[in-house]
Amino acid sequence: RKVNIGMDEAHLVGLGRYLILNGVVDRSLLMCQHLERVLDIADKYGFHCQMWSDMFFKLMSADGQYDRDVEIPEETRVYLDRLKDRVTLVYWDYYQDSEEKYNRNFRNHHKISHDLAFAGGAWKWIGFTPHNHFSRLVAIEANKACRANDIKEVIVTGWGDNGGETAQFSILPSLQIWAELGYRNDLDRLSAHFQTNTGLSVEDFMQIDLANLLPDLPGNLSGINPNRYVFYQDVLCPILDRHMTPEQDKPHFAQAAKTLTDIKEKAGIYAYLFETQAQLNQILSSKVDVGRRIRKAYQEGDKESLQEIARQELSKLRSQIEHFHALFSHQWLKENKVFG
């Protein structure tokens, strides 16, 4: 009977209405007092609690960061010593590309408690397209650190930030990778097991990331999401053009659309994922340079080119987006209740 009580990212705890009514208090102590109250309720109903650990570090580090050394005030230490056996702290981290970075954070956690779990991430929260490649990179390093620190429980999160645009089943490679690491501690059988489970090779399935895999992006960067910023940018207000290189990005998206269309034909029950991504990449290929060409034609007074872009290219782009809307709607309703 486990329950996760959250309590993460409470950056303004003690600074709102509470501050007006009660004045300044040690915020880490306030967290402990509230935690004790919640644990008392959980105990009453026979639940063991887990909670995200980040706020203890953000409240007790000098600069409010998760990955810094902490100095625990004595009054807070008394509370923590009393509570630490009643709650499992979940160290969540979806970003680090080296084992040592995780190890450093585990060492900090051990200052508070040894009842720890770890939460890694299957990246599906940066737009319409997942990032299984980055998920794999960080999973391998996190798994090493979890084993080195004798962590017995690992959670893999797949958050739905900003509208849950990424398909639920698009992160199957990430889940299989974590399963292999968890049960075997290697990826030697990843391809065979993934083929058995899905009917598709993991190499093919990983191509679902293509809208995020621009040729010049280092593999260890997280949160870079051309699938979203190219899609949403206003063609008449191209404020993100500095992040685009049309001469390489346009053919990349065009080839990605073709690759994903080919994979769709052998993807079986997952074909809808690749059809949606193929259409998205077609849109990105059409759109990535059109704003620049509109501005260039406007500055040069080239009304003929402007008319051609408006009547042909933008009309085609609108049709592509309408088709994507239909595909995305089908994908959404296949995986979710209508409101998510």
Residue spans for each PLM region:
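Active-site groove signature of glycoside hydrolases
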Residues: 1-20
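Substrate-binding groove of N-acetylhexosamine-processing glycoside hydrolases
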Residues: 2, 20-340
